[in-house]
Amino acid sequence: MKLLKLTGFIFFLFFLTESLTLPTQPRDIENFNSTQKFIEDNIEYITIIAFAQYVQEATFEEMEKLVKDMVEYKDRCMADKTLPECSKLPNNVLQEKICAMEGLPQKHNFSHCCSKVDAQRRLCFFYNKKSDVGFLPPFPTLDPEEKCQAYESNRESLLNHFLYEVARRNPFVFAPTLLTVAVHFEEVAKSCCEEQNKVNCLQTRAIPVTQYLKAFSSYQKHVCGALLKFGTKVVHFIYIAILSQKFPKIEFKELISLVEDVSSNYDGCCEGDVVQCIRDTSKVMNHICSKQDSISSKIKECCEKKIPERGQCIINSNKDDRPKDLSLREGKFTDSENVCQERDADPDTFFAKFTFEYSRRHPDLSIPELLRIVQIYKDLLRNCCNTENPPGCYRYAEDKFNETTEKSLKMVQQECKHFQNLGKDGLKYHYLIRLTKIAPQLSTEELVSLGEKMVTAFTTCCTLSEEFACVDNLADLVFGELCGVNENRTINPAVDHCCKTNFAFRRPCFESLKADKTYVPPPFSQDLFTFHADMCQSQNEELQRKTDRFLVNLVKLKHELTDEELQSLFTNFANVVDKCCKAESPEVCFNEESPKIGN
């Protein structure tokens, strides 16, 4: 298998799909051919990702059998493209071969998907994915010396194992992202294995790779969840806002062309159609670079790079400069006498234009806030256009926009103040209690992960000049992850209402939630309050995870207690751990002190 070189197959966070059509222009043909060659050269990696995401429980050995089968299929089709099997969509071929593996569908409980065909089967495989991967064993780790020996002796096997383990734990992450992570992983391994201090090098250089994966995972799940719960129109408006901020000089007609190119058929990437996702990501990149003069002045150098590098370059490029002739506000949406008539003539285009004009004038606002303003404007016109004097009614729209922005800003300022007062750990415990109270039905691991991500939003953003947009964007991703990708996911009535009622106002909805009154706590178990000397032998990170899990389980068990009472019990726990780990006999100390924690 050839060395992966897909670092640039990303555009912002836009791994989106569109219908596959044969290229007609020379530039399109060149782009299609280079993308096709990449897919052919990396069929093994692509198969690993698809199989590991569709059948997360499958063993590495089972995956190897499918890889061998897919490579043979590719070789047959390259030798004779007229074979009947070569006219099928790659994702259909892959799923057919997965279903044909003897005993596999029954062993891993997906035989019901194999009884379906085409779109129904693809959707079934998608719904079979599990975001909570607690059923998988811990991520296998190697001693740095062993890892380097494995890399030097069998690089291909190490990379295959790595991609398999990462893909099965991230079933909704798009293929280009996972391939890019594999590129970065190999770069880290190759560089650090030549260093004398391999441990420090691997630990330090692995952090940005992990952060990259987490960030893209959250975003992609968020947008796929929006697509499945709210439909294409919401995704369309998300990208109008994003692209208008990034490229404020773009013409509206060109923007809509790009947005449609980007968001028209998002299904492929969200479903896990790996080949289609890669093809269409490349097409989006080509679209941008073929129209760069009318899109942005910041991407010229990026577009001169080859396909593997240009995407990453565009991601890292700054927002384009605001056009000098762009007024601070666009009056035609609030001052014109004909607003209602223009809205009625073509509502979708009218509100798309409003989103475009408002977003490119407000690069300081978050995407959720821009969508809230669009919703407020829609609601305002729905009311005003039914009055005797519509212009006199919607003339004050800007006041409404400023009012909601001020409200959102105060929420962020209050949360950042909490962070400053409580510190990182204190804020995390605050959110672990809060999230567990509103969604106690979630698994302990999922709640711990959500709490960590919420705290990351504040530690990342609360010291930045663009604090508001940063916090609001990242916190919205956390709630998107809580809601999940699957449209059929249910947690409890209050949470489900926030997840499914209004995408733009999802976060304010969550902020207003109280403890779930429908929840029935599990029976009391003294095991929760029983600790042993191994607590003292845990490394810092492991001890922190145990502490976080204890707090979540404590809230689940004593759901009726106030935050202050829960904090008091948690303080008792922390004091016992501190006391016993300093004792001459930690085990004896834990046996004596543990029962007192829950009292």
From Swiss-Prot:
GO molecular-function terms, A-Z: vitamin E binding
Primary localization: secreted
Tissue: High level detected in plasma but also in extravascular fluids such as follicular and cerebrospinal fluids (at protein level).
Glycan attachment positions: 33, 109, 383, 402, 488
GO cellular component labels: blood microparticle; cytoplasm; extracellular exosome; extracellular region; extracellular space
Region ranges (Binding pocket for hydrophobic ligands): 215-319
Keyword Signal: yes
SUPFAM superfamilies associated with the record: Serum albumin-like
Domain of life: Eukaryota
Annotated Albumin domain residues: 22-210, 211-403, 404-599
Similarity field: Belongs to the ALB/AFP/VDB family.
Protein name listed in UniProt: Afamin
Species per Swiss-Prot/TrEMBL record: Homo sapiens (Human)
Recorded name of the encoding gene: AFM
